[in-house]
């Protein structure tokens, strides 16, 4: 969560996160659909461990990613309201555009675009709330999710964070206070 505007938020992802977070956001949205609209069942991992799974009653079941870390703060935040989901979908859409701009190809997660555009049927209606900071405690700023994520980038991610030359990017007035 690097900017309140979903397009600018996508733009502000460093190169490594443009690649990595597209997958994680698709997993979050897939998990929201499965947890909210699916039927719980138990499966077994290859090692025999019992796994919680959710089966969707329609073709999404064979298309969407499996549910992951359903109690992770980001997953809980996403399922709290339709506006949280819509914000993440918009940011993810723009992040996919960012990926194409920076790397000259389409990310494989784009195959999920039309299946994730709709909110889960059973998601509560509500206002957007800033994402819950999912980071070490020392980076969290009470009541300031945006500031927390900027601090996290500065203190914990600065060693690898770099941005491709973005001088021609379509967004005006980029803000990267953590550089």
Please identify what each model-predicted range represents.
Residues 108-158:
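An amphipathic alpha-helical core segment
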Residues 169-179:
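Single conserved hydrophobic/aromatic residue that forms the stacking wall/gate
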Residues 86-121:
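Charge-dense polyanion-binding interfaces
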Residues 1-100:
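An N-terminal structural lobe/cap that precedes and organizes the functional/catalytic core
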């Amino acid at each position: 969560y690097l900017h309140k505007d979903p397009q600018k938020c996508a733009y502000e992802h460093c190169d490594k996160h443009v690649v990595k977070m597209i997958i994680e956001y698709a997993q979050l949205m897939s998990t929201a659909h499965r947890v909210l609209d699916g039927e719980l069942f138990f499966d077994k991992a290859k090692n025999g461990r019992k796994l919680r799974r959710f089966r969707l009653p329609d073709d999404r079941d064979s298309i969407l990613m499996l549910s992951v870390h359903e109690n992770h703060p980001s997953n809980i935040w996403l399922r709290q309201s339709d506006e949280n989901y819509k914000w993440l979908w918009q940011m993810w859409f723009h992040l996919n555009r960012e990926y194409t701009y920076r790397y000259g190809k389409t990310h494989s997660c784009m195959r999920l675009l039309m299946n994730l555009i709709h909110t889960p049927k059973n998601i509560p209606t509500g206002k957007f709330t800033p994402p819950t900071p999912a980071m070490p405690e020392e980076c969290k700023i009470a009541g300031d999710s945006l500031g927390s994520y900027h601090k996290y980038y500065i203190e914990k991610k600065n060693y690898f964070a770099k941005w491709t030359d973005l001088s021609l990017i379509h967004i005006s007035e980029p803000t990267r206070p953590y550089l």
